[in-house]
């Protein structure tokens, strides 16, 4: 068998997120949560669960937490989640991939400047949900060729894809 891959494993953003949760486990004796699974890897999520990390998936669950640490998943989350964490004075570890965080900043700036934001991806994927949550106003999500028609009504507007 010939092995062609020069490397294998997680990309740096995912590895950074996973490392941040394990580091938090070592340094923190309190309750630790992740907002959504830290990554799309059942073995990692299961191992973290066995070590006491609880995955929360909704704003309602987040609002019920009175103390502890919440780790933001590698895919990022909407700005609303950061606001709730701040309001509740919960410790936060932001494990959002730096590339994803850069997209959050771009859509925030561009939508604040009046541009219509168009996101290419699956509307229900956590990364897309997070990106949409940084848009001021509404974002258009294009999943496939059929969705391209959504753009037609914005032909004369300033857009950011």
Question: Where are the language model's segments positioned?
Answer:
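The feature marks the mature, well-folded catalytic cores of soluble enzymes
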Residues: 1-160
């Amino acid at each position: 068998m010939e092995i062609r891959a020069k490397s294998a494993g997680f990309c740096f953003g995912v590895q950074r997120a996973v490392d941040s949760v394990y580091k938090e486990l070592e340094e923190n004796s309190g309750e630790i949560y992740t907002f959504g699974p830290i990554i799309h890897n059942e073995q990692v999520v299961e191992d973290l669960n066995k070590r006491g990390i609880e995955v929360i998936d909704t704003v309602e669950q987040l609002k019920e937490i009175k103390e502890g640490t919440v780790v933001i998943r590698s895919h990022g989350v909407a700005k609303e989640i950061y606001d709730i964490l701040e309001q509740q004075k919960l410790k936060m570890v932001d494990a959002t991939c730096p590339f994803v965080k850069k997209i959050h900043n771009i859509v925030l700036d561009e939508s604040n400047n009046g541009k219509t934001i168009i996101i290419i991806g699956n509307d229900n994927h956590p990364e897309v949900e997070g990106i949409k949550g940084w848009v001021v106003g509404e974002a258009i999500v294009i999943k496939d060729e059929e969705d391209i028609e959504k753009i037609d009504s914005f032909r004369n507007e300033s857009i950011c894809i």
